[in-house]
Amino acid sequence: MKIRWKLLLALLLVSGAGVLAADVEIIAHRGASYDAPENTLESVRLGWEQKADAVEVDVFLSKDGEVVLHHDATTKKIAGVDRKVADQTYAELRQLDVGAWKGSKWKGVRIPKLDAVLTTIPDGKRMFIEVKCGPEIIPALGRSFRKSGKSPDQLVVISFNYEVVKQAKAKFPRIKCFYLSSFKMDKESGEQIPSVEELIAKAKAAQLDGLNVSYKGLQSEAFFKKVKSAGMGLFTWTVNSSDVARRLAKRGIDGITTDRPAWLRERLASADSE
């Protein structure tokens, strides 16, 4: 009898962990950026190969109006050229090597257009597009979305720039839009800022679909409850710890952005703690 109970308990533990993995959307941060150069076709495709539910990419508007993948405002860190993305044409950006820094096997990898990246989205999966510039990119985003032929439920717009997500939601009402936020502590009050109430109010004012915040600000269950009570989605970034991911999953996070999608999914599906 004791053996049967032990077997039943083991099955429940495994089943419960599996539910965590199934309930949480695993989002590949800049593609599978732990293994491949970030924000490239190579990292995006690898993200899909690693069974990510979604892939997140960063975009800027080039000098000639193309929506291109890149994280920083300049190309210095990745390509060694200290020029703003916005001051370079796509032809100039395509001359840059954005793979060699990751290793010799990636030498020659180039900056892609969003158009090319959107074509990779498999059926039933979606792409989170983080806008790193201002709302001037929105008309070009619309052209890319229409050209892709992807359904609105396969596209998500996110940004730290409130005006961007506000205008994006007004322009693309059928596309999910989430407000990105990090946090800091107020030295005088000791309170976390911005507060969850402030974030919810801003999201509601722009009719956004929810929040996408740093996991470091998700220390209390109250944060989760308030966002859920407001009827909003709650996503987080950038989690490469299995312990943190499990804690957030148990509290009801909707999605986790990670550099290691396959690895994190395996950890969430496992009952073994590390």
Q: Predicted segment positions?
A:
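Bacterial N-terminal signal peptides that target proteins for export
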Residues: M1-L9
